[in-house]
A protein has these predicted regions:
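N-terminal export leaders
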Residues: 1-2
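N-terminal maturation segment of proteins
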Residues: 19-464
């Protein structure tokens, strides 16, 4: 399965270039600060495998780290501190400086944790993402469940009825390639009109198993992505639509491709060639990816899109046009309450890692409050318990809340342009929250709730 065809292009920027990883293209030579930031991230990845989610920058920096002696975590924490001290005199652009500062707080936190300076779970999240999550009141989930209950046919336990409803709209694995290719093409066309596409971008999609996530974007550089869709559990049509938009257009693939073309290629900000998990950039990236489907498919087209997915997937319900449309309408009506219900994952992570609940207690919470069937609850908890994703679980829900508020403080007609900024700029959660506050103050009638950025972290994680 593939998206758009086209050959990758070298970075079009004046000045010296150097071979990128993979050896098929060049990138600008990084300035000293970006070089040392990249080295720090790659060195940390040797201690925390998977921290580097993607790297498409200079090949010699990766080779340097591969050949050198493993650097102690305490030394890496000192390296991060030294970079923070250098920021004011070496990085002139305010947005770039703020972005690097937030990233460095996270990297310093990870290094200090490795060195034995562990933080409480909430503090670890705050230092990692420049954002403090909040525990949801279970009444929110009860209200969402009541909305879903009213929309579902039949009687009996809600979890059973919801599982039975979802089973009617599962896409058979052998039909996934056809449906995914069609969705990718459709969403790419929409994204091209709204946001433009870098010349030569492309992606390919594969089906995988035995993963803790539903979908994953591996960005290779050269404007190329590999997208994996996990088939461990049945995939319902509406979830497939969300996942494809999230991972491709206008989600992760388009974000990474534009940032490579613009930030790295045109502006020479080589730090953006290193994609790091558990850093503030993830909160923004996941927020835009979650909301991407709302730009990929306008609200007035959602029902028609689902009906066509049912047809292309060869679902039995597609043979009855009226039943298919009714099913799509109910599914769309359940979208927002189901999203609210999914925020029970935030509480589950807090219960597990902050409150000290057992695996079984957390599993029971997900099934009771989140209305998840046992197999899906186990898969969610597997993700929550993974060392690398134990804090990452928050970025989907918190990122969506933050980015949605940021979009909604401007008129609807301005939101595609505003969303486009997320594809091109180095924005931090703190900067986005500040823009929300400024817009809300200027337009109090908009009624936007205040955003909740983290307070400025102490000079040393865990310090006073």
């Amino acid at each position: 399965m593939t998206g758009a065809a086209g050959a990758p292009t070298d970075a079009a920027v004046g000045g010296a270039t150097t071979p990128a990883v993979g050896g098929e293209r060049n990138v600008p030579v990084p300035d000293p600060f970006a070089r040392d930031y990249i080295l720090l991230g790659i060195r940390l990845d040797q201690h925390i495998p998977g921290l580097v989610d993607g790297y498409f920058g200079p090949a010699d920096l990766k080779a340097q780290v591969d050949m050198e002696q493993l650097r102690a975590p305490s030394r890496l924490a000192e390296d991060a501190e030294a970079l923070v001290a250098r920021l004011p005199r070496e990085v002139a652009d305010a947005q770039r400086r703020d972005w690097l500062a937030a990233q460095l707080v996270a990297l310093r936190t990870h290094a200090s944790t490795l060195a034995g300076d562990r933080l409480p779970y909430i503090d670890e999240i705050t230092h990692s993402f420049a954002w403090t999550p909040i525990r949801r009141d279970d009444a929110i989930f009860d209200a969402a469940a009541a909305e879903i209950d009213a929309l579902l046919p039949g009687s009996g336990p809600l979890a059973d009825r919801l599982a039975a409803w979802d089973a009617r709209f599962e896409v058979a694995v052998d039909r996934l390639p056809t449906v995914i290719d069609w969705l990718v093409g459709r969403f790419r066309s929409t994204a091209s009109v709204l946001f433009g596409l870098p010349n030569g971008e492309d992606l390919r999609v594969s089906l995988v198993t035995d993963r803790p996530w539903s979908g994953y974007n591996a960005y290779d550089g050269g404007l190329r992505s590999r997208v994996d869709i996990n088939t461990d559990l049945p995939i319902r049509a509406a979830d497939l639509v969300d996942t494809v938009a999230h991972e491709t257009y206008p989600g992760h693939h388009l974000e990474h491709a534009w940032k490579e073309a613009d930030l790295v290629g045109r502006q020479g900000r080589l730090e953006s060639s290193l994609i790091l998990l558990n850093t503030p950039e993830c909160l923004i990236s996941e927020g835009l990816a979650v909301l991407g489907v709302e730009f990929a498919t306008p609200p007035d087209e959602e029902v028609d899109l689902l009906v066509e997915v049912y047809e292309r997937a060869g679902m039995a319900i597609a043979s009855d046009r009226g039943a298919a449309r009714e099913g799509a309408e109910r599914t769309v009506a359940m979208t927002m309450p189901r999203r609210r219900l999914a925020e029970s994952r935030v509480n589950a992570a807090l219960i597990r890692h902050s409150d000290g609940a057992s695996h079984d207690q957390t599993l029971a919470y997900l099934q009771r409050v989140g209305q998840y069937p046992p197999q899906l609850a186990e898969k969610i908890l597997e993700f929550i318990e993974q060392p690398l994703s134990r804090t990452y679980v928050f970025v989907y829900h918190e990122g969506e809340v933050l980015v949605r508020r940021w979009l909604e403080v401007v008129p609807a007609g301005e939101r595609p342009g505003r969303f486009g900024r997320l594809l091109h700029e180095q924005l931090t959660p703190t900067a986005v929250a500040a823009e929300i506050a400024a817009a809300s103050a200027a337009l109090p009638a908009a009624g936007a709730a205040p955003a909740r950025a983290a307070a400025a972290p102490p000079s040393r994680p865990g310090g006073g």
